[in-house]
């Protein structure tokens, strides 16, 4: 038996993030809360979200259970709700029931065995920069009509995001005094597919800062928190494979 109650804003942001890389997802619910890990079909990007039970208005489960869902069906339910509402969620056999104010709706669950939960790779780097989300987004937006990739550079002086084509280029330069926190005693560079980053940054609306970690030609790790509930923040991790330059 699963009975949950969560803010529509939180559920929408979780769903928006997952929909940037997958069409189906499997949620795990246990005594600690709810979590989900998903990887896109090309194995380029991965998202991990951990929702502590304190983030729920109501949280009840008889034990560990899995809920597999079609993301578009979930989004269709969320569209019926006001952003200021909470949504009640109950697992009833092979269906998931939703209570949204005066509206009750149910959707069919998928077979959890058909969705593989990927293992999170051991990606670590001692080099990182904590950036304002607004600064990072501006750098990505400046590059979106120029190229399909963007190169990040981190040094003792700060962080740069550079993109170019045969006729155009863009560069965002953040000196270290505009960076919330950083650790780097050398110069590292790596390029990443811009499309994934733009979808990701568009989907997260409630976070103020992002922790970027990478090395030369190495996967990018972005750690963040969704801030709808300051006392019980939803922890997020976004991993992105590098774009190898010729």
Curated annotation (Swiss-Prot):
GO-annotated molecular function: DNA binding; DNA polymerase processivity factor activity
Described function: Sliding clamp subunit that acts as a moving platform for DNA processing. Responsible for tethering the catalytic subunit of DNA polymerase and other proteins to DNA during high-speed replication.
Organism: Thermoplasma acidophilum (strain ATCC 25905 / DSM 1728 / JCM 9062 / NBRC 15155 / AMRC-C165)
Assembly notes: Homotrimer. The subunits circularize to form a toroid; DNA passes through its center. Replication factor C (RFC) is required to load the toroid on the DNA.
Gene Ontology biological process terms in this record: leading strand elongation; regulation of DNA replication
Family statement drawn from the similarity comment of this UniProt entry: Belongs to the PCNA family.
CDD domains, per the entry: PCNA
InterPro entries per record: DNA_clamp_sf, Pr_cel_nuc_antig, Pr_cel_nuc_antig_C, Pr_cel_nuc_antig_CS, Pr_cel_nuc_antig_N
Membrane spanning residue stretches: none
Source organism, top-level taxon: Archaea
Name of this chain's protein: DNA polymerase sliding clamp
Pfam families xrefs: PCNA_C, PCNA_N
PROSITE patterns registered for this protein in UniProt: PCNA_1
């Amino acid at each position: 038996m699963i009975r949950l109650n969560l803010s529509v804003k939180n559920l929408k942001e979780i769903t928006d993030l997952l929909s940037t890389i997958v069409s189906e997802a499997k949620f795990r619910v246990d005594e600690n809360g709810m979590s989900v890990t998903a990887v896109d079909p090309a194995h380029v990007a991965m998202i991990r979200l951990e929702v502590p039970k304190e983030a729920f208005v109501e949280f009840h489960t008889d034990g560990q259970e899995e809920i597999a869902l079609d993301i578009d069906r979930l989004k269709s339910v969320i569209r019926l709700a006001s952003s200021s509402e909470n949504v009640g969620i109950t697992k009833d056999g092979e269906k998931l029931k939703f209570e949204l104010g005066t509206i009750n709706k149910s959707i069919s669950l998928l077979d959890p065995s058909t969705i593989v939960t990927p293992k999170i790779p051991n990606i670590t780097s001692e080099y990182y920069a904590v950036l304002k989300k607004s600064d990072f987004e501006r750098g990505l937006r400046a590059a979106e009509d120029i190229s399909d990739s963007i190169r990040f550079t981190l040094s003792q002086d700060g962080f740069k995001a550079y993109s170019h084509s045969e006729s155009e280029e863009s560069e965002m330069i953040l000196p270290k005094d505009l960076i919330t926190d950083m650790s780097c005693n050398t110069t590292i560079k790596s390029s990443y597919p811009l499309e994934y980053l733009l979808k990701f940054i568009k989907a997260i609306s409630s976070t103020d800062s992002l922790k970027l970690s990478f090395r030369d030609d190495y996967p990018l790790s972005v750690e963040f928190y969704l801030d709808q509930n300051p006392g019980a923040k939803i922890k997020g991790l976004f991993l992105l494979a590098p774009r190898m330059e010729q």
